Amino acid sequence: EVDTFEALDHAKTHYPIDEDRICVRGFSMGGAATWHQAVHHADIWVAANAGAGFAETAVYQNVFSKEPHPPTWEQKLWNLYDATVCAGNLHQCPAIAYSGEIDKQMQASDIMAEFMAKEGLELPHVIGPGMGHKFHPDSKIEIEDWLKTVVAKGRNKNPEQIRFTTYTLRYNRMHWLTIDGLEEHWQRAQLDADVIDKSKLQITTQNITRFSIDLQQCPLNSDNEESITIDGQHLAVSTHYVKSNGAWASCTETDNSS
């Protein structure tokens, strides 16, 4: 992913690029990279298009059909890369998948569709008739038409709703929210936010001890003393929040020691 961002930054120095209309796309190994980039950096793309490739470790590699099974600590570390466990982040990034009809790597699209469905998302899946590990010409047209519609709208940089899943502070930001501390690393952390009528912000957390709000980007237009609710607790507007003894409080700065 570092190579991707370095290449993108370099391209921006040579071409006029609209940062609100950048798609992440790839096929085969590029399809695997696309799923990874799409879920872990969902807030920077206007859309994602993955073809074939893989989206997780265990099923794709048929890991548990062999003995001995990987130790639990190794399985936890799959959460650094696996796209399936963070499929809910695609609430922030519309995605479309492609598979050849007889390509065994259709498995990646199928399992992403399964995990996205658990998050209330539906994955459009274009299947190339009679195709193995390659694109069908008609499928290209169908995908391009879908992308043109999404790209025309542009990226929503200031969403009123955020659904953010992570397992590590390596991927700790989604739009105007940043997770600064976890109760237990490599376990699922969830930070969901809803701005209601521009005047109230409701936040729910799981496995999080600290987080920050970018008030310049958050579409909240209120400084009411109790316009923010965190896990049912009413609090004044602030940039940083910390959880201690089960209760949330505002703080002046973040402490990444958590």
Q: Which positions does each model-derived feature cover?
A:
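Alpha/beta-hydrolase-fold serine-hydrolase catalytic core, especially in secreted/extracellular enzymes
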Residues: 114, 118-258
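Mobile cap/lid helix-loop segments that gate and shape the active-site cleft of serine hydrolases
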Residues: 43-93
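Acidic catalytic loop of the alpha/beta-hydrolase fold
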Residues: 101-107, 133
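Hydrolases whose catalytic domains are alpha/beta-hydrolase-1, hotdog thioesterase
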Residues: 33-37
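Short beta-strand immediately N-terminal to the catalytic nucleophile in serine-hydrolase-like folds
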Residues: 24-26, 49-51, 98
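Gly/Ser-rich "nucleophile elbow"/oxyanion-hole loop immediately N-terminal to the catalytic nucleophile
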Residues: 1-29, 39-45, 89
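Catalytic His-Asp charge-relay segment
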Residues: 92-99, 124-125
